[in-house]
């Protein structure tokens, strides 16, 4: 399992290829790649803040829980911090399992956590200046469904 926070751009295709290499006992790999977007051209950049040692530990803990909950063989998470331009990759999540359902569900579970509960602080830089961004009601609802299924 790998959890990485980085302030450097990354190439998702390279990560997918590396994650899939040599997996003779794996039946399924699911991936998610999140990109920074400009809402109708409004955002010039997204800024993500994290506490080193705390944020990555929290993500590692939820990833370890996902390994157990979904019988995963492996997990790889890369999450950007710092200033991210529209179109750049923010997050990469890959899950490996014996079967597709577990890989898909685990990837979804991890993204719901990263989107709504992971200790990141998000600021959007737009034409009217910076503004802090909170998880949306939908983000919270998506994450809560996993609490009900536990």
Swiss-Prot record:
Biased composition (Basic and acidic residues): 136-150
Keyword flag Transferase: yes
Region annotation Disordered: where it falls in the sequence: 124-150
Entry EC number(s): 2.8.1.12
Chain residues that bind substrate: 35-37, 99-100, 115, 122-124
GO biological process annotation, one example: Mo-molybdopterin cofactor biosynthetic process
Catalytic activity: 2 [molybdopterin-synthase sulfur-carrier protein]-C-terminal-Gly-aminoethanethioate + cyclic pyranopterin phosphate + H2O = molybdopterin + 2 [molybdopterin-synthase sulfur-carrier protein]-C-terminal Gly-Gly + 2 H(+)
Molecular functions per Gene Ontology: molybdopterin synthase activity
Record function comment: Converts molybdopterin precursor Z into molybdopterin. This requires the incorporation of two sulfur atoms into precursor Z to generate a dithiolene group. The sulfur is provided by MoaD.
Subunit relationships: Heterotetramer of 2 MoaD subunits and 2 MoaE subunits. Also stable as homodimer. The enzyme changes between these two forms during catalysis.
Protein name: Molybdopterin synthase catalytic subunit
Organism: Caulobacter vibrioides (strain ATCC 19089 / CIP 103742 / CB 15)
